[in-house]
């Protein structure tokens, strides 16, 4: 079993107060309001806890809408993949893809009739404008001081832990690699032991009962589906596989991995490649992927040719603060940021940008070649991502949710995310999950709602002990209680308290808040 080194602490730079910019949904010039911070590096657990408090990332910029003030409140939404059953419209999209692959048939009619076809992504124009204006004070020279401070701090922890007989301790990685100019650090090499075989010969005995034969066919089908999904998780090409016949209703996997004739018109492969730090597969396909993004932005979002630049693409969809982590009990591909590439006949036609976190797969963005919009790639990719989450759950049981970003009830085009049931919305005041069916009546009456029906309920994860918050100041990591004793400006505490309440007690004690 390969050893695993825990990542260094997250390092963030919080921008005090609220920021107003043009809304990407209703186009209100100053209607969108949010809090924000720049994440120089972030652990996947910290980001998991942040999105469970209403935060979301755009590149390395992490923001949280001011829900009771912003023009279009954005509620975090998650789907339950393990209980998910495709609807009739979902099955229609999957069958349309199969017909196209098998016979080259192109569905007639207006592709815009599909509710998700060109609206699978969140609006980000306002974020880009904001990021360009950010005053980021934590530079590389300052960040290089973090390594020594963390190493010193963790050595003390290591001594203490060893005394207690613990087998694990933290090994800080090079802070220059993680937090530098945006150039990738070297991928972490993890030895993966040989995969278990498929067991004994599965040949059918001479005499077997019908029930036993059905069970055997079902077992073979599950093995085929697991094999295909496992290949996808490791970045290997995945083709549609033959399926075992069954009288049972078709599952999501049945519909996705349905058999194709040997002379099929097209071949679809799905590959998952790590985008940060960039894997060799990601580097090799970067230009082709960017060209798909550029065309998508120009055709679907009507961007001028000079707007979707390589720099913008990299900053928004390739750069990520998330550390690559490979714990023994995690998914084979590890945690972090990835691109799920859809290859049709040897060329990329769509890319889903994903974060794989301890408890979920989080969808960041989708872009595709507009020439293939008739395939309803927004719906198709969401269904593939749900199936991908189910596959990851097989090895990592706590990874059982599919986060679809934000649900925006006040914007009709963005209500499509509520079609993936069962799903929950995050209460913006108490940060508990509430079934979407219970939330919709309230949202029909008011665009901002508290979903938790208990009037006495409070935010249990709120900051309770400000002095335990961690800061990074003058080459040292320290508790806020120590830091404030050396500060002459008492007004600074208001901004620190605002940050602490927004990120919650757990994150405030783990993440390092940079102080200039």
Curated annotation (Swiss-Prot):
Quaternary context: Monomer. Interacts with LIAT1; LIAT1 is not a substrate of ATE1, the interaction takes place in the cytoplasm and seems to increase ATE1 arginyltransferase activity.
Q: What would be the name of the gene that encodes this protein?
A: Ate1
Q: Which organism does this record belong to? A: Mus musculus
Q: Which Pfam families match?
A: ATE_C, ATE_N
Cross-referenced InterPro entries: Acyl_CoA_acyltransferase (IPR016181), Arg-tRNA-P_Trfase_1_euk (IPR017137), N-end_Aminoacyl_Trfase (IPR030700), N-end_Aminoacyl_Trfase_C (IPR007472), N-end_Aminoacyl_Trfase_N (IPR007471)
- EC class (word): transferase
The EC number(s) given in the record are 2.3.2.8
Q: Does Nucleus show up as a keyword for this record? A: yes
Instruction: Kindly list the cysteine pairs connected by disulfide bridges.
Output: none
The compartments listed are: Nucleus; Cytoplasm
Q: Name one GO cellular component term.
A: cytoplasm
- Record key words, sorted: Acyltransferase, Cytoplasm, Nucleus, Transferase, Ubl conjugation pathway
What is the catalytic activity of this protein?
an N-terminal L-alpha-aminoacyl-[protein] + L-arginyl-tRNA(Arg) = an N-terminal L-arginyl-L-aminoacyl-[protein] + tRNA(Arg) + H(+)
Any keyword Nucleus? Answer: yes
What is this protein's tissue specificity according to the annotation? Widely expressed.
Could you tell me what this protein does? Involved in the post-translational conjugation of arginine to the N-terminal aspartate or glutamate of a protein. This arginylation is required for degradation of the protein via the ubiquitin pathway. Does not arginylate cysteine residues.
The molecule here is called Arginyl-tRNA--protein transferase 1
Q: Basic and acidic residues: which segments have biased composition? A: 150-180
Q: Where is this region: Disordered?
A: 150-206
Chief location category: nucleus
Regarding protein family, the annotation reads: Belongs to the R-transferase family.
The protein's GO terms of the molecular function aspect are: arginyl-tRNA--protein transferase activity
Q: Which GO terms describe its biological process?
A: proteasomal protein catabolic process; ubiquitin-dependent protein catabolic process
This protein's source sits in the domain of life called Eukaryota
